[in-house]
């Protein structure tokens, strides 16, 4: 497994949950397997991050926050749904013109549109063709430069970190949701949905990613729903081990996932 790209830079730092941070984590794993030299330029101090030691063991090169001095002309610099990356584009482009934005959402950010107008983004990457076809025409109207590329890629998922769970406790029915704590990640009727569905055994909920912002949006969860602020309190693996079903209503869509049965 190899790559024609020998080194790349990413603005940000991976995390154990949350879409963009998790995607970056898994991509770094496969990039290093492919022999790519990976540089991280975070927006904050990263030494206390849960994945710091793993990044060291993988041989990832980490720079001081917002320090672009190591970037050379021709180096690709990526931002995974990162507002800080969009704001730093003028400085980044003083070092390289190979700027790549991966928008993990289904909408465009105002600063993303502005960057397109100014020609600050050389490539847009999307996880699926449907989102690309929706976003590309809107951005093309802002800047018709044919050199700006719009491509899709297949995100890497490190399945080894999530072994198949064949058996779960039969004494209760585990349900839950997992996301960052932002209010937009929660539908206002989340608790109504959780309270309304029935189970032949006791229900036990788990909300991984919950704080005062979440509570201000939906209210205080029922006593039978455990809340965890982030992955430092409950790991992704423990969340999926608990959950037979994931009910994830948000402001924009309602996703229903079920765990495979034995």
Regions picked out by a protein language model, each given a short descriptive name:
Residues 156-233:
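Conserved catalytic-core segment of nucleotide-activated headgroup transferases in glycan assembly
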Residues 9-11, 29, 42-123, 130:
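Extended catalytic core of nucleotide-activated donor transferases of GT-like folds
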């Amino acid at each position: 497994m190899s790559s024609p790209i020998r080194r790349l830079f990413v603005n940000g730092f991976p995390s154990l949950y949350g879409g963009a941070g998790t995607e970056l984590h898994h991509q770094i794993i496969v990039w290093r397997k492919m022999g790519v030299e990976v540089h991280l330029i975070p927006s904050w101090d990263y030494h206390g991050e849960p994945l710091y030691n793993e990044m060291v063991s993988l041989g990832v090169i980490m720079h001081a926050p917002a320090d672009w001095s190591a970037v050379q002309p021709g180096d690709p610099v990526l931002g995974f749904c990162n507002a800080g990356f969009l704001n730093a584009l003028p400085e980044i482009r003083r070092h390289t013109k190979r700027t790549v934005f991966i928008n993990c959402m289904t909408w465009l950010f105002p600063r993303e549109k502005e960057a397109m107008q100014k020609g600050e983004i050389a490539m847009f990457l999307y996880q699926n063709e449907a989102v690309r076809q929706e976003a590309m025409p809107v951005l093309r109207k802002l800047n018709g430069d044919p050199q700006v590329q719009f491509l899709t890629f297949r995100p890497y998922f490190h399945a080894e970190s999530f072994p198949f769970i064949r058996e779960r406790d039969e004494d209760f029915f585990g349900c839950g949701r997992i996301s960052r704590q932002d209010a937009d990640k929660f539908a206002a009727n989340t608790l109504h949905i959780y309270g309304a569905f029935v189970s032949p055994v006791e229900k036990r909920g788990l909300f991984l990613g919950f704080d005062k912002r979440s509570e201000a949006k939906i209210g205080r969860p029922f006593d039978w729903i455990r809340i965890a602020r982030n992955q430092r309190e409950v790991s992704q693996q423990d969340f999926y081990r608990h959950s037979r079903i994931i009910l994830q209503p948000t402001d924009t869509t309602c996703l229903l996932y079920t765990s495979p049965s034995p």
